[in-house]
């Protein structure tokens, strides 16, 4: 009809309204953006406006089959050759939760390994859409992922803008890129696993993760369940955050060291969450890591808070100093997270990394390491107990 809307246009508008109704999360407040800029993390409770929608998302994750064929009680360890195997391809295409597989580099042996983590299962929402469409139809009897699919689409369209809008008036506020190609979403069920200390953005040309956003969907969570995430802003207090229902935990992927405590006694299928990674501004990242060696040496003459502030904001400085500064914590978390075959490789590589730093021939950089260790030993911030 002339002047009127076509059927397709009306259908699209209805879908947009339904999306807003189902997925319009509570606005990200400027106070959360300010806390993120100042402390490196923020917590947003009751993130999904409609609690029933969050419950449906949890139920859809729990309806997905878990594929535990990759191993037994020990870690599955593979040496990588840079090529994708047939098994890797099938993992991408199959709509099942698969064992978490962690890349680990042993610099001393110049080898990269792939470890399957016991008790942690994941599904990447970027896997083939055809598989997801089949799941929607319920043709395989597994239930649908319709709500998760719509949430996935909404994160690509709106989540980056939500953070950017909240940070407009915040000094050094976060800036992330909107769009489907600039975010990753993974679903996860944890039936008894843990994660050692790490950064979500390990660096490299292909990594531009800026924000990690974890939405927890554990309605019956109790403290005895464990599974907390522990964040460690450099030289700050250890922040333990419980994975309670409809809680969004946000932190900088490249500069906030963190681990996950072992999940135990979770009701149902286990600890359920989904993680969204948002990419940052490329130009901004290039500026930050210009010459960390000279910057660190020059800051030796400055007050400790200036050195700490610089390290917190500089990804390459964090990667250089974190194992040295928190070497005991790294080791303990490895022991608690990898009880199988991968543990020996990881402990050896960790010890080797620390030893190589001790043997650095750059006297000024050695002074930086000594200064950082002295600051850690006298750090009163760590005495604070933060549990959220």
Where in this protein do the model-derived segments appear?
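Non-heme Fe(II)/2-oxoglutarate
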Residues: 20-169, 291, 326-329, 336-349, ...
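Intrinsically disordered, low-complexity segments used as extracellular stalks/linkers
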Residues: 9-18, 72
């Amino acid at each position: 009809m002339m002047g009127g809307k076509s059927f397709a246009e009306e259908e699209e508008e209805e879908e947009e309204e339904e999306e807003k109704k189902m997925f319009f999360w509570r606005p990200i407040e400027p106070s959360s953006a300010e806390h993120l800029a100042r402390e490196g993390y923020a917590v947003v409770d009751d993130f999904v406006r409609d609690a029933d929608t969050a419950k449906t998302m949890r139920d859809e994750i729990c309806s997905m089959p878990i594929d535990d064929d990759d191993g037994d009680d020990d870690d599955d360890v593979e040496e990588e050759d840079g090529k994708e195997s047939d098994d890797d391809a099938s993992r991408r295409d199959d709509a099942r939760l698969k064992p978490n597989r962690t890349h680990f580099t042993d610099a001393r042996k110049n080898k990269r390994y792939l470890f399957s983590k016991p008790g942690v299962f994941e599904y990447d929402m970027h896997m083939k859409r055809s598989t997801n469409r089949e799941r929607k139809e319920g043709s395989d009897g597994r239930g649908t992922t319709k709500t998760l699919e719509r949430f996935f689409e909404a994160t690509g369209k709106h989540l980056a803008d939500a953070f950017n809008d909240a940070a407009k008036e915040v000094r050094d506020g976060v800036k992330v890129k909107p769009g489907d190609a600039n975010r990753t979403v993974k679903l996860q069920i944890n039936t008894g696993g843990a994660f050692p200390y790490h950064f979500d953005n390990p660096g490299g040309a292909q990594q531009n993760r800026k924000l990690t956003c974890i939405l927890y969907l554990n309605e019956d969570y109790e403290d005895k369940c464990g599974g907390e995430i522990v964040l460690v802003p450099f030289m700050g207090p250890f922040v333990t955050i419980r994975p309670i229902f409809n809680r969004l935990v946000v932190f900088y992927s490249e500069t906030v060291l963190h681990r996950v405590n072992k999940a135990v006694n979770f009701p149902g299928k286990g600890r359920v969450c989904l993680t969204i990674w948002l990419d940052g501004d490329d130009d901004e990242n290039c500026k930050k890591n210009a010459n960390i060696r000279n910057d660190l040496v020059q800051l030796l003459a400055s007050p400790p808070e200036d050195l700490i502030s610089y390290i917190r904001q500089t990804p390459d400085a964090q990667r250089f100093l974190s194992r040295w500064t928190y070497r005991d914590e790294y080791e303990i978390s490895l022991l608690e997270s990898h009880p199988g075959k991968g543990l020996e490789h990881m402990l050896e590589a960790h010890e080797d990394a620390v030893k190589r730093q001790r043997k650095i021939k750059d006297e000024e950089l050695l002074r930086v390491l000594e200064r950082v260790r002295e600051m850690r030993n006298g750090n009163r911030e760590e005495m604070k107990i933060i549990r959220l």
